[in-house]
Amino acid sequence: MKLSMPRFDQAPVLVVGDVMLDRYWHGGTSRISPEAPVPVVKVEQIEDRPGGAANVALNIAALGAPAALVGVTGEDEARQSLVDSLAAAGVRAHFQCLEHQPTIVKLRVMSRHQQLLRMDFEEPFDTDPAALLTDVESLLAGVKVLVLSDYGKGALKNHQALIQAARRHGIPVLADPKGKDFEIYRGASLITPNLGEFEAIVGHCADEAELVAKGAELMRQLELGALLVTRGEHGMTLLRPEHAPLHLPARAREVFDVTGAGDTVISTLAASLAAGEELPQAVALANLAAGIVVGKLGTAAISAPELRRAVQREEGSERGVMTVEQLLTVVEDARAQGEKIVFTNGCFDILHAGHVTYLEQARAQGDRLVVAVNDDGSVSRLKGPGRPINSVDRRMAVLAGLEAVDWVVCFAEDTPENLLAQVRPDVLVKGGDYGVDQVVGADLVKAYGGVVKVLGLVENSSTTAIVEKIRKA
């Protein structure tokens, strides 16, 4: 399945559901309490993060998609913490505020990256479904997907009214279901239960065949557009009427914390569908996102650069031959990680030991090496008739196989100045015995604060000499 990074900036999503605050007390533990056989935690840091439906909205915004959120809170400091955090992330929050009920808070006591205790502060909300529906209807015209983030805490009491309102606007509805009554999600475009939630409705599934059969029957009964069952370490399974099941293996490299993984799945799905991705591609992106987030501690969001790198790994484009557009994307991501970009260029017609040594020295000037290669027309103009010996595709393929080289790209001009202006490397490297000021592009690189270096060439290593020797043989 071919994956690409969606245009999330053009994918507005509305999230409606149970808003909560995830609060973390971090501290050290070095002794047991004399009062009871429990550890004593010396609290050193208090951290608040949006949770529940608020975490879904935060994940959507972190991907770069416009996110709006409708939910219910109390009139307290936890609400203000949510408002501040969401505003800082660019989420437009519309909260129904209840004076006599608290905002839901999940307090976790953490020590040495381990959760020791969780305390829940909550009461079922006594909400006004009509007021919530009014808020949602006022926002539907400006979004492309509606997400129902249901934790069974009372914010969502009119599921069918919300689904029907979205359908009148032609907007797909995604629901992360809770409880043992999935009838309330009838007519949804997609629901995303985990395996435990799914089996609580349909009964135990002995194998994948039974899961598929029971899932198909559930879709028929509830008139669902699709069903996605998330299965932890076994990945996820997408079922659609009149389509073969799609099984995707889990992508996590290391699992530290599954908190909020379901939120990440539905948020990535929603943003991807809003950006115009087909459902299988959106599910594959959500699977990659889940694999990233479970490698983080606590309720966490993933960023667009993190997902983009995962897509590039999946498509085998993290290294190697690239288009200019692909190169600019990976350079941007590498720079965001604090990596120093090195740039060099040349014809590299017949690769020899001198080239390899030079490229290794160039790579040592930073963290990532970009090699820009003259295309065939450019080489012919520079070197004369009969050159290049090897086509640009072959030259680039050989360079991409070198350990020192991260990315290879070609250019059609006689000099790489236009490409340099786009890449803006931290270090421009050229091999030869001339001065820095004679290097093409040196003025451009130095003007924005970059560094230009000239490396010596390996003696008795010349492509031109090799070509002449072969011709005389």
Swiss-Prot record:
Q: Which organism encodes this protein?
A: Stutzerimonas stutzeri (strain A1501)
- Which residues does the record give as ATP binding sites? N194, L195, G196, E197
An example Gene Ontology biological process: ADP-L-glycero-beta-D-manno-heptose biosynthetic process
* UniProt-listed PANTHER family: BIFUNCTIONAL PROTEIN HLDE
Q: Would you tell me the Gene Ontology cellular component terms?
A: cytosol
The protein's name is Bifunctional protein HldE
Write down the superkingdom of origin.
Bacteria
Listed as disulfide-bonded, the cysteine pairs are none
Q: Which GO terms describe its molecular function?
A: ATP binding; heptose 7-phosphate kinase activity; heptose-1-phosphate adenylyltransferase activity; phosphotransferase activity, alcohol group as acceptor
> So what does this thing catalyse?
D-glycero-beta-D-manno-heptose 7-phosphate + ATP = D-glycero-beta-D-manno-heptose 1,7-bisphosphate + ADP + H(+); D-glycero-beta-D-manno-heptose 1-phosphate + ATP + H(+) = ADP-D-glycero-beta-D-manno-heptose + diphosphate
Cross-referenced HAMAP family: HldE (MF_01603)
